[in-house]
């Protein structure tokens, strides 16, 4: 999905960031396990440490030392290393309920883990494929400025979707616990609470995006770039309507995982993040082109 102008930057960034892949995977996994261990605040602290470290090192490597894209990649990778160490240290403390111990491979358990994790896995993998397809379509029908607008929307979408993922992950273990205890009434009540919370979040995010579209866009694009700025604001406002529905897909998919129905969850995840997106992309570009 890169262009001739950005290909070298992409190569540099991907090469360096790939050196830290294991830390991205382990850090994210441990964050979820720490929450499951009953320490959600600690998990939040770990994420904040990673974010602050990333910002600080970006300033040092990119601005002070002038390392450019390579510096940004190293900053992100090192932040994940520190996050991984922080989360690992939790399981070495006495207060943790879960401990690091020797284990034997139980393929039945591993199969269960894979089946329950498959819906989220497909969603994550779909992001890369969809991004490539969108980049190619934007370059074909509009041009490089469209990639800038799309990048801005992707940043905002990530922030919004992660907020909604947080709500989903917050209610999932509670639903799973009550489902295992056969407390069906509690399961239904928790699901309703999750839906209501997601509804309030969706409405709030949508209204904020519409009201402050100009201000948010100005964080990424110089207002002096009038045409690019205005087109990004326009597209951003249109895209904001998707936030009204995004959270419900996430929480319903997460609910099915929590009650041990991964196939239903996988169907929703694949439809939301890949199948329907690709179909819509091809159909709408055929009908409307760059519009």
Predicted regions and their residues:
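Short loop-to-helix capping motifs
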Residues: 3, 39-40, 68, 143, ...
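Hydrophobic/aromatic residues within transmembrane alpha-helices of membrane transport systems
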Residues: 10, 19, 34, 39, ...
